[in-house]
Swiss-Prot record:
Disulfide bonds: none
Keyword terms: Ribonucleoprotein, Ribosomal protein, RNA-binding, rRNA-binding
Entry's Gene Ontology molecular function annotations: rRNA binding; structural constituent of ribosome
Gene name of the encoded protein: rplT
The protein, known as: Large ribosomal subunit protein bL20
Alphabetical list of InterPro entries matching this protein: Ribosomal_bL20, RIBOSOMAL_L20_CS, Ribosomal_protein_bL20_C
The organism of origin for this protein: Acaryochloris marina (strain MBIC 11017)
Length: 116
């Protein structure tokens, strides 16, 4: 069997992990085993939270739209139903932005949806 030397490979692998762990506190950025655990955890959290961020923003937009529509005497669910019937194709992100930055145009949209 031929001899396999893999010192460079191991060093490269460890340096890669320590580079990813840069900025972590204490031994989490210095010791390979602990740094490796922290990097794995960080990557796991990042993966999970990229998906969670989409849900969180949707909840935020819904809360903002609900607050704005209730000022006009309509609940969120009724408003969304009216929008569908009126065939107004604005997504929740746009509606929330309008409600926050341009209340006048948002009130016009509420009126238009209410007529349908």
């Amino acid at each position: 069997m031929t001899r396999v030397k893999r010192g460079n490979v191991a060093r490269k692998r460890r340096k890669k992990i320590l580079k990813l762990a840069k900025g972590y506190r204490g031994s989490h950025s210095r010791l390979f085993r602990i740094a490796n655990q922290q990097v794995m955890k960080a990557l796991r959290n990042a993966y999970r939270d990229r998906r969670k961020r989409k849900r969180d923003f949707r909840r935020l937009w819904i809360a903002r739209i609900n607050a704005a529509t209730r000022q006009h005497g309509v609940s969120y669910s009724k408003f969304m139903g009216q929008l569908k019937r009126a065939d107004i194709q604005l997504n929740r992100k746009m509606l929330a932005q309008l409600a926050a930055t341009d209340p006048d145009s948002f009130s016009k949209i509420v009126e238009l949806a209410g007529k349908a």
